């Protein structure tokens, strides 16, 4: 018999110590990785529930196992909420991750060797949009598109590439692009060559849900997203569509299960259902509006201090610092800021002279700091501290001074009060 008072602390001290150290790290460090966020205790409650015990291969009402009457309710709640939140008429909440959702789309629509137009990773795309080290770049013929000298997507070049290469699918979406994507324009280009238009909105899903960023669902044939990042739910994936036929939706479902996954993670799907409900609250819209304001506030400080921001600004939750002119590598900037308890990630910039393991830039995002209560004033102050570190990257005294300021503001604005 299992006893509810069983706990990790009494049983596995080594594991518990690492878990507790991570709790301290999250509370005492400022998190600026654009893809990270803090999920609510309600989501964590769902993920730690007895739903983790249940196998449920198949879909609500069509399971391969018995005893699924209650997990059917859980999954249907998640499906219905996803459709309502994003204005879709189809949703699959089973993908274990955003990458798994993307795998399912590729598998449903394409054959190996088909041509795909995707955003260049160095210009802000994602691994699953055609990187040669990823399944997408290995199995499909990838033609990359990118940004122009102003840092905006070059739609003329995209249209030209589409006309020349006649891809079966065009991918919209990004992991490090700070502009507004013209989804309607991309759909127009896709329609001109009879291609699928697939959008990966993983980074901006929360902004989209709150009406702060344009919704791709009315324009794309298929949309995928993660359920964490700006959406602030559990780590997982989601597939959405609107206006498609039942044959397409059946292909997508079959591509997820049994095509690429087995049993769904019902405890995570419950977490998705909670997060989707939270995203419908008025407070969530206020949060997302503040995310965008904080990112803009930080950009203004970096520009004032003489730092180059790719595209010159941001219209979402993230931006890229280009450090080429400062003769600082992304790797060194990442490490120095880390010693000041400020967490970022090194990132390639357009025409980067450095390797992806070194890079010439850092990516900065505002979802996590906004979640813990930062407003524009704190965001500007933080950006100033970061400039102090980068201006004196080898001065440990400066780094230590900034670290003490970081610890103070983290104590004032805890993640979990």
Swiss-Prot record:
Homodimer. The record marks 228 as: Plays an important role in substrate specificity. Belongs to the SHMT family. It comes from Yersinia pestis. Signal peptide: none annotated. Pfam families: SHMT. It is an enzyme of class 2 (transferase). The keyword Amino-acid biosynthesis applies. The keyword Amino-acid biosynthesis applies. PANTHER family: SERINE HYDROXYMETHYLTRANSFERASE. Pathway: One-carbon metabolism; tetrahydrofolate interconversion; Amino-acid biosynthesis; glycine biosynthesis; glycine from L-serine: step 1/1. It is found in: Cytoplasm. It comes from the Bacteria. Its main location: cytoplasm. This is Serine hydroxymethyltransferase.
């Amino acid at each position: 018999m299992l006893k509810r008072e069983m706990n990790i602390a009494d049983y596995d001290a080594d594991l518990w110590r690492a878990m507790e150290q991570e709790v301290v790290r999250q509370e005492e460090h400022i998190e600026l990785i654009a893809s990270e966020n803090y999920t609510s205790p309600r989501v964590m409650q769902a993920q730690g529930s007895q739903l983790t015990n249940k196998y449920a291969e198949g879909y609500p009402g069509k399971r391969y196992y018995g005893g699924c009457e209650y997990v059917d309710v859980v999954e249907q709640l998640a499906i219905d909420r996803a459709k309502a939140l994003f204005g879709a008429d189809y949703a699959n909440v089973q993908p274990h991750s955003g990458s798994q959702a993307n795998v399912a789309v590729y598998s449903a629509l394409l054959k190996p060797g088909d041509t795909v137009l995707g955003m260049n990773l160095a210009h802000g795309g994602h691994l699953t949009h055609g990187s040669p080290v990823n399944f997408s770049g290995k199995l499909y013929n990838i033609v990359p598109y990118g940004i122009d000298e102003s840092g905006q997507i070059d739609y003329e070049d995209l249209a030209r590439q589409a006309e020349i290469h006649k891809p079966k699918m065009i991918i919209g979406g990004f992991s490090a692009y700070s502009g507004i994507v013209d989804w309607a324009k991309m759909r127009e280009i896709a329609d001109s060559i009879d291609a699928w238009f697939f959008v990966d909105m993983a980074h901006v899903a929360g902004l989209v849900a709150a009406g702060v960023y344009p919704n791709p669902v009315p324009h794309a044939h298929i949309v995928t997203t993660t359920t964490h990042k700006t959406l602030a739910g559990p780590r997982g994936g989601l597939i959405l569509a609107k206006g498609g036929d039942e044959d397409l939706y059946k292909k997508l479902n079959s591509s997820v299960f049994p095509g690429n996954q087995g049993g769904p993670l019902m405890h995570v799907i419950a977490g998705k259902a909670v997060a989707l409900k939270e995203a419908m609250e008025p407070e969530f819209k206020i949060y997302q509006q503040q995310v965008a304001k904080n990112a803009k506030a930080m950009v203004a400080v970096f520009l004032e201090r003489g730092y180059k921001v790719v595209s010159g600004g941001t219209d979402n939750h993230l931006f890229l610092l280009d450090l080429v002119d400062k003769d600082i590598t992304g790797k060194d900037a990442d490490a120095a800021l880390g010693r000041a308890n400020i967490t970022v990630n090194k990132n390639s910039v357009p025409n980067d002279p450095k390797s992806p393991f070194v890079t010439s830039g850092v990516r900065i995002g505002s979802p996590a700091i906004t979640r813990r209560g930062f407003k524009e004033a704190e965001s500007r102050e933080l950006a100033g501290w970061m400039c102090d570190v980068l201006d004196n990257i080898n001065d440990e005294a400066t780094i230590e001074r900034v670290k003490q300021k970081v610890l103070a503001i983290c104590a004032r604005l805890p993640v979990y009060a």
